[in-house]
């Protein structure tokens, strides 16, 4: 826990002030005091609430009104002694619950992943003695010894550092290691700039040091994230909410119909109670689309597989559907919208300015003087040759071609960009021998090397332009040395910085005779400026296309980055992001209240110098405006924003395990274009889900109406509960998968996102279900009325009706392929799924009609061939009627 302390945050305090505020010393606290503080502050562990046991989570999947209907029907069947019917109905309910249980979200794993990041033991100094203790026993005031490879056990203020570098990517998302210091810092600094603090869960990459515990357990930065994650409520997707409402509406309709028919049959038909109950159970079972939850889950699963082939791993099934409704995508810049390969685009010398081709680490691309279409030729001994040798040799990175043919760099991206630039030009061979080196240091902001280069001894320097300008009195030109023209250089740097380029300068000086060592003092005079390189992380070409596709599809793309506003706006313009001419910073967002933030979140598309906490607030602000939000992230701090978003998108390559666990979707290539592909697939899946729902519902209505008509007419029960379940679970489910493989419609990415408030069962859908369901029911009833007086057995009549309904289903599946056009198109032949399920359906129907054990189980009997022909003709007639209905209702559908 954290001690209560007024005043400045720990990173602004000196070591002495920090020790005093937590009542400790360099020798640490005593064991007795540690025990007292442990009692006061609690264990150094992330708080967690107990999860539900698996059996309870399984039982929860029976909490559905339509499942209640099935369970009630099974109970009544048991009371009546119809054990086979009861077993079949119960099996259907259990299968639905199992599918829901298996597909259940694993969101709680993200919390466990955070807890797993804590180390198990730490070396603490107590009363001057080094003790290895469980990390759970650490308390504020403990002095912790840290070494390379250690995982930081709590939030610490550094009190001693020896080349201490820490990998904080899991917390900040920044891939570069952070050099730690003991000095106090000033200003309101973001997490990644607090270089005298160590954060729980991060890893020491090199060096050693000591730190004093200032926060434990839930009060650490990791604890705050854990608390945010635990407090985020799971949100249901639009389709799941709509299906809940549909289920309740069907439940109410079933109750009303059963009550009305019960009263009618008792008063006007004088039916035996047992026969009446059997009919009402059949009505209830017929009205429940038992297979629909399983069908939806399986169709979503097929969408998951399709997206996986496009490098998008879907972790939570409903995400597939939500992608199709997404209205805003908030994306990181580096690596997602850009190549994540820093590339030199311009070189400034005293004589000229050059532009450089190339957008990656591949050393390919010509160099041109500005306004000159002819590539430059690098003359031996020229200024440009010396400049290229300097950036090549004063450089700790290496350029490597992997076996796959891809080019990679080792070392930092800035040095790597300079190394690639030097490799784009073939320089005359020249022997070189490194004599001494000053590594890059964040305090001095340059690196320097002492080389024997051919016959001369030289000192080479690369670093921040403002620093090298202070070191240089002269500039090199092809005509010789000139006094440094500072206004020229500053003007050019400002010009290119406005275009989003990061600037790095290079300089040299002749070495002293016999010099073998290099010190900072050697650079205080005689340094000559050679040139300045402007570099950037270029946009991914496919991201530019993907953003254009998103904008055409009515999806706004917002770029969220830690870069400076000017850089962010420049990249935004290249990418074609909507309002890229304006940017807002994280500092400006922090001072806004929720109302102001919700306005800014919609007004701006470029968010610069932001923190992961800003992301979380931006998601909430956009959601408050009824936006369906996608959010990308890679660091642990991004996890709350990803969990809060409607679609959280984690980076598969640079993302942490915690982020992936919190996300709904993981990109295996960290590429924005993959998100756009997933949106396209999500829309296709939703279209096919809607077609499937429109396909399934008329069958249930037809079954229910057929039973109602039979009861009103006093006829024999046309379908038994097990036959109804056969149709709902076997034939309907089988045929539904044919629609799951339908290709996306041509305008799928040229229409706006669907409004999640519009129910999947809208006005037209209700009409189509009522129209087709009534037509099938009336056709089957007429056939039943024709068969009954001719002396056929109830089993034969039910078998004919079953085959009639199934054949009508098959033809209606073909109707559902195309929403408002003719269904028998070339796409029908391309959809192999339809022909596979048609073959499976034929086998199933042959089994239930002709296999003796199936006849005994379902009460069917064999049919002569002519009845297959009759049912085929009836089904084909209904197919033609629905095709004629499409153009007549097209205007209604459009409205």
List the predicted regions and their residue ranges.
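Generic alpha-helical transmembrane segments
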Residues: 731, 776-777, 799-813
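Membrane-water interface at loop-to-transmembrane-helix junctions
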Residues: 756-774, 794-800
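A C-terminal functional module that forms or caps the active site or interfaces directly
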Residues: 816
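Conserved cytosolic headpiece of P-type ATPases
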Residues: 1-750, 758-761, 774, 785, ...
């Amino acid at each position: 826990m954290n001690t209560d302390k007024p005043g400045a945050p720990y990173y602004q305090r000196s070591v002495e002030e920090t020790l005093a505020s937590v009542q400790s010393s360099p020798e640490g606290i005593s064991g007795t005091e540690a025990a007292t503080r442990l009692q006061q502050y609690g264990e150094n562990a992330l708080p967690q609430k107990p999860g539900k046991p698996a059996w309870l989570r399984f039982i929860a999947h029976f909490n559905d009104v339509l499942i209640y209907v099935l369970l009630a029907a099974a109970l009544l069947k048991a009371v009546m002694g119809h054990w086979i019917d009861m077993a079949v109905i119960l099996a259907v309910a259990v299968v639905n619950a199992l599918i829901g249980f298996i597909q259940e979200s694993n969101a709680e794993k993200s919390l466990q992943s955070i807890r797993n990041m804590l180390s198990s033991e730490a070396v603490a100094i107590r009363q001057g003695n080094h003790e290895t203790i469980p990390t759970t026993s650490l308390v504020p005031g403990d002095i912790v010894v840290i070494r390379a490879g250690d995982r930081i056990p709590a939030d610490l203020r550094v009190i001693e550092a020896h080349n201490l570098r820490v990998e904080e990517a899991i917390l900040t998302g920044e891939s570069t290691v952070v050099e730690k210091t003991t000095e106090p810092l000033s200003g309101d600094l973001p997490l990644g700039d607090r270089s005298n603090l160590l954060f729980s869960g991060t890893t020491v990459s090199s060096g050693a040091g000591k730190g004093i515990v200032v926060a434990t357990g839930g009060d650490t930065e990791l604890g705050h994230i854990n608390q945010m994650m635990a407090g985020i409520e799971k949100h249901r997707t639009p389709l799941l909410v709509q299906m809940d409402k549909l289920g309740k509406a069907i439940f109410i309709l079933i109750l009303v119909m059963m009550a009305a028919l019960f009263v009618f049959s008792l008063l006007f038909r004088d039916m035996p109670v047992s026969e009446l109950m059997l009919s009402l159970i059949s009505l209830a079972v017929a009205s429940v689309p038992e297979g629909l939850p399983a069908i939806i889950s399986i169709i979503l699963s097929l969408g998951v597989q399709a997206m996986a082939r496009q490098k998008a791993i879907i972790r939570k099934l409903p995400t597939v559907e939500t992608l199709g409704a997404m209205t805003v995508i908030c994306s990181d810049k580096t690596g997602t919208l850009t190549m994540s390969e820093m590339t030199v685009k311009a070189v400034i010398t005293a004589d000229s300015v050059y532009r450089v081709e190339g957008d990656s680490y591949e050393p390919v691309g010509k160099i041109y003087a500005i306004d000159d279409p002819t590539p430059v030729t690098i003359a031996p001994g020229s200024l440009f040759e010396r400049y290229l040798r300097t950036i090549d040799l004063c450089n700790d990175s290496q350029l490597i071609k992997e076996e796959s043919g891809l080019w990679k760099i080792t070392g930092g991206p800035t040095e790597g960009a300079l190394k690639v630039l030097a490799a784009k030009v073939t320089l005359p061979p020249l022997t070189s021998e490194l004599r001494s080196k000053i590594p890059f240091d964040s305090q001095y902001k340059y690196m320097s090397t002492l080389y024997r280069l051919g016959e001369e001894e030289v000192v080479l320097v690369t670093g921040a332009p403002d620093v090298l300008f202070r070191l240089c009195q002269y500039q090199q030109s092809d005509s010789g040395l000139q006094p440094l023209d500072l206004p020229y250089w500053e003007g050019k740097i400002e010009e290119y910085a406005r275009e989003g380029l990061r600037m790095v300068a290079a300089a040299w000086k002749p070495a002293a005779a016999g010099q073998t060592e290099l010190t900072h003092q050697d650079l205080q005079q005689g340094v000559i400026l050679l040139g300045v390189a402007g570099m950037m992380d270029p946009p991914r070409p496919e991201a530019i296309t993907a953003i254009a596709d998103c904008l055409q599809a009515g999806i706004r793309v917002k770029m969220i980055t830690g870069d400076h506003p000017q850089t962010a706006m420049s990249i935004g313009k290249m990418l074609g992001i909507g309002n890229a001419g304006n940017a807002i910073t994280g500092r400006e967002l922090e001072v806004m209240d929720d109302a102001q933030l919700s306005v800014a979140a919609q007004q701006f598309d470029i968010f610069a110098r932001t923190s992961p906490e800003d992301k979380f607030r931006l998601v909430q602000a956009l959601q408050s405006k009824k936006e369906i939000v996608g959010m990308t992230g890679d660091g642990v701090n991004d996890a709350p924003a990803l969990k809060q978003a409607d679609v959280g998108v984690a980076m598969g390559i640079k993302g942490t395990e915690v982020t992936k666990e919190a996300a709904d979707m993981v990109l295996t290539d960290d590429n924005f274009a993959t998100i756009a592909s997933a949106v396209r697939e999500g829309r296709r899946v939703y279209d096919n889900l809607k077609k499937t729902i429109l396909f399934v519902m008329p069958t249930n209505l037809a079954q229910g109406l057929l039973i109602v008509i039979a009861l009103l007419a006093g006829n024999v029960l046309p379908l038994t509960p097990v036959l109804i379940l056969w149709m709902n679970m076997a034939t309907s489910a089988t045929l539904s998968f044919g629609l799951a493989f339908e290709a996306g419609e041509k305008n799928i990415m040229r229409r706006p996102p669907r409004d999640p408030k519009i129910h999947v069962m809208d006005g037209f859908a209700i009409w189509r279900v009522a129209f087709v369901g009534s037509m099938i029911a009336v056709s089957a009833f007429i056939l039943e009325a024709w068969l009954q007086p001719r002396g056929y057995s109830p089993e034969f009549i039910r078998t004919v009706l079953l085959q009639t309904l199934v054949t009508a289903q098959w033809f209606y599946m073909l109707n559902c392929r195309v929403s408002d056009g003719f269904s028998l198109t070339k796409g029908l032949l391309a959809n192999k799924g339809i022909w596979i399920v048609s073959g499976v359906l034929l086998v199933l129907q042959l089994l239930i009609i002709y296999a003796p054990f199936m006849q005994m189980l379902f009460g069917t009997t064999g049919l002569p061939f002519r009845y297959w022909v009759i049912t085929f003709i009836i089904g084909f007639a209904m197919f033609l009627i629905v095709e004629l209905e499409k153009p007549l209702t097209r205007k209604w559908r459009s409205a």
